[in-house]
Amino acid sequence: MPWPPVFGKVFMSPLQDGFSRRFYYLRLSITDVCNFRCTYCLPDGYRPPAGGKVGRQPFLSLEEIRRVVSGFAAMGTRKVRLTGGEPSLRRDFTAIIETVANTPGIEKVAMTTNGYRLKERAREWFDAGLTALNVSVDSLDPRQFHQITGENKLAEVMDGIEAALAAGFKSVKINAVLLKGLNDHQLDAFLAWIRHKPIELRFIELMQTGEMDTLFRDHHASGALIKQRLLDAGWLQQLRGADDGPAQVFMHPESMGGVGLIMPYSKDFCAGCNRLRVSSLGKLHLCLFGDHGVELRDLLTADGQQDELQQRIRSALVGKAATHRLHEGNAGMTPHLASIGG
């Protein structure tokens, strides 16, 4: 069956790299700005590029977002995740959701958020077409949360999660970056919290980036330790679907919620890669830890550039590597996770 028409054209072939991996999932950063100061991402807060406003590129406009999403949709993309920075800081965020959700071929629109605006906006975003949420909650202890994020807003974030569930979201996931000595002892508290909530808790191993070498050395903890504790407590690892992401998911018969482990240092982590990334300035990134981005923005100025846009994306995909090089201490040119949306 052909893919739906986009800009009057029908495309038959989905995106695929040289290792037979197919890419149905786009992570689209719409801003680098964030109002939190998480130790593992932007410990000093968001700092605009040097030089002030003169010469600084603006983030992708609503029309540029429409064109890039349409281009990916024409090549088989079915899911778009809006990331940042904190995506909800965009004044036109609801319009962005509507634009992406109304793109022919797009079936799921997700966002990753720090959750500080969820309580007031969850219903609005749901009605606009947002279908899934990932909310960052690195600790359930208010003091620890404040220490990790730089903001004393745990209560507001937790209220936002409840508001999202009440608004009708069926897919709510909680992201917690695993930090040795900070939150790696809080597994029992997290499991008790999700026991009666239909959410998936995802522990993410701390990843090495250019500006975080010291933090990585001091606080990296292996997700394998959490995995063993789950198995010992009767949690069952779920079979991974062909189009699932890298998370290893566990369920327990006495828990409504599940647990996902994202362990980029584990064997074969990249084998099932199904996602591509576009930065807030319009660069295509084939890997979170790649060395260079591929410029797309010059092909986002008019609807008539779709053929060229899609060809550039396909050509770039030929060069996608089989795996990252984190085991070699090589994090590419990613200075921090906010720079291309994590």
UniProtKB/Swiss-Prot annotation:
Per the entry, which co-factors are needed?
Answer: [4Fe-4S] cluster
Role played: Catalyzes the cyclization of GTP to (8S)-3',8-cyclo-7,8-dihydroguanosine 5'-triphosphate.
Record protein name field: GTP 3',8-cyclase
* Highest taxon, organism lineage: Bacteria
The answer on whether this UniProt entry bears the keyword Zinc-finger reads no
Q: Where does S-adenosyl-L-methionine bind?
A: 40, 85, 136, 207
Please tell me where GTP binds in this chain.
27, 81, 112, 173, 275-277
Gene designation: moaA
Question: What molecular function terms (GO) are annotated for this protein?
Answer: 4 iron, 4 sulfur cluster binding; cyclic pyranopterin monophosphate synthase activity; GTP 3',8'-cyclase activity; GTP binding; metal ion binding; S-adenosyl-L-methionine binding
| Keyword tags | 4Fe-4S, GTP-binding, Iron, Iron-sulfur, Lyase, Metal-binding, Molybdenum cofactor biosynthesis, Nucleotide-binding, S-adenosyl-L-methionine
* UniProt source species: Aeromonas hydrophila subsp. hydrophila (strain ATCC 7966 / DSM 30187 / BCRC 13018 / CCUG 14551 / JCM 1027 / KCTC 2358 / NCIMB 9240 / NCTC 8049)
User: Which portions of this protein are annotated as coiled-coil regions?
Assistant: none
Q: Gene3D superfamilies, from UniProt?
A: Aldolase class I
